Structure formats: structure tokens, C-alpha cells
């Protein structure tokens, strides 16, 4: 049950997610992006994985902080390991981010599930076999064919309802859209 190795592998995957100048996500044409998988391995060969982006699992951060805390430790001590890793954040000059801690936490839970041959939702007490999902609409934009008007939001919401969603979460317009925010436009979109 002792963690003996921490590895990061990179691969290409296809996404339709694009970001504007303020970092807000928008749909767009498919394109290739670099993706990373963080793997924790134990002495008996079990592995736990977490998929993330390369910036979250940079080699320096993994070597200096994650490996230092995890290697030689019992993976079942998830809470203590998380706190030990969080302790290093303060002195890391913002290199060890909450997202890195989250990626490690997911890999530890995945490792626990694989070791016990149980899905993680059962390990944390889940009892439902299905849950309702809501459709989340990306931020508004000024792009042709995007979410530039309240009517665009309405059409997209109708598409989500036709797909079976019972609830919809709106993200309306914000900078860098030139005229945002505008409460009247937000209300129209709703």
C-alpha cells in the first residue's frame, strides 16, 4: 500500500474548447491540445490516475513537492497526505496550486477505488445510480454563430431542453465583450 512512484505522461487529445483574451471558455472548431495524466503507483503494482493539464503537473512541482510528500507513504492516508501537501503551498511561491492538490487528491481516490475494486462514489458513500445533470452555457461573446444575443441564448437553451436537461446554468456576458456587463441583456437572456 506504499506509494513508490509518481509519474506524469503527456498526450494529445481533441477538444472544442477555446479561450478568449480574458480566459473564458467558448466552443469552437475541434483542435488538438496537450493533456496530462498523473499516475501514482504502489509497491504492489496498483495505480491511481488523474487527468489534468500540463501546467498543473509541471516537472519541478511534481519532483519538489508531490514526490517528496507521497513517496514512501501509505496511499490510504489520503487526508493526511493532502494536508501534508497543502502545508507546502505557503512556501512554494504559488507554484504548488490548489489544482495540483486536486489532481493528487483525485489520483489518491482513484488508487483507493482500484485497490479495493470499488467505484469511488461507493467509497465516499454514494447511493444513487443516477443524478440529474444541468446544461451549463458558456460565457456570452460577440462571435458570429456564438452567444452574442439573448435570442442566441434562447435557441441554445431550447437545444438543451430538447436533449432532456431540466435545468440550465447561464454564464452571460462579461469583459472582454465591449459592452458587458449589462444587466438588461442578462435579464433578456434569462
Spell out what each predicted region is.
Residues 1-49:
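Structured beta-strand/loop patches that form or line metal/cofactor-binding pockets in enzymes
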Residues 10, 54, 172:
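Residues that line or immediately flank small-molecule/substrate-binding pockets and catalytic motifs
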Residues 26-28, 122-123, 157:
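A generic local secondary-structure boundary/capping motif
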Residues 28, 99-100, 147:
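Residue-level marker of alpha-helix boundaries and capping positions
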Residues 41-116:
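Metal- or metallocofactor-binding catalytic centers and their adjacent structured scaffolds
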Residues 105-140, 144:
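Glycine-rich, aromatic-flanked loop segments that form ligand/cofactor-binding clefts
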Residues 130-131, 135-190:
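Metal-dependent enolase-superfamily TIM-barrel catalytic cores that perform enediolate-based chemistry
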Amino acid at each position: 500500500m506504499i506509494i513508490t512512484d509518481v509519474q506524469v505522461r503527456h498526450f494529445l487529445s481533441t477538444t472544442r474548447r477555446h479561450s478568449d483574451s480574458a480566459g473564458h471558455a467558448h466552443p469552437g472548431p475541434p483542435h488538438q491540445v496537450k493533456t496530462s495524466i498523473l499516475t501514482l503507483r504502489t509497491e504492489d503494482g496498483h495505480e491511481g490516475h488523474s487527468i489534468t493539464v500540463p501546467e498543473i503537473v509541471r516537472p519541478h512541482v511534481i519532483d519538489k513537492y508531490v514526490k517528496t510528500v507521497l513517496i514512501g507513504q501509505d496511499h490510504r492516508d489520503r487526508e493526511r497526505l493532502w494536508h501534508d501537501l497543502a502545508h507546502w503551498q505557503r512556501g512554494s511561491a504559488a507554484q504548488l496550486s490548489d489544482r495540483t492538490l486536486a489532481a493528487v487528491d483525485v489520483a489518491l481516490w482513484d488508487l483507493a477505488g482500484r485497490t479495493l475494486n470499488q467505484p469511488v462514489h461507493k467509497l465516499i458513500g454514494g447511493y444513487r445510480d443516477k443524478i440529474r445533470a444541468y446544461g451549463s452555457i458558456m460565457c456570452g461573446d460577440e462571435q458570429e454563430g456564438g452567444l452574442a444575443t439573448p435570442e442566441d441564448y434562447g435557441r441554445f437553451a431550447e437545444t438543451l431542453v430538447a436533449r432532456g436537461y431540466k435545468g440550465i446554468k447561464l454564464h452571460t456576458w462579461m469583459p472582454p465583450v465591449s459592452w458587458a456587463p449589462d444587466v438588461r441583456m442578462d435579464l433578456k437572456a434569462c
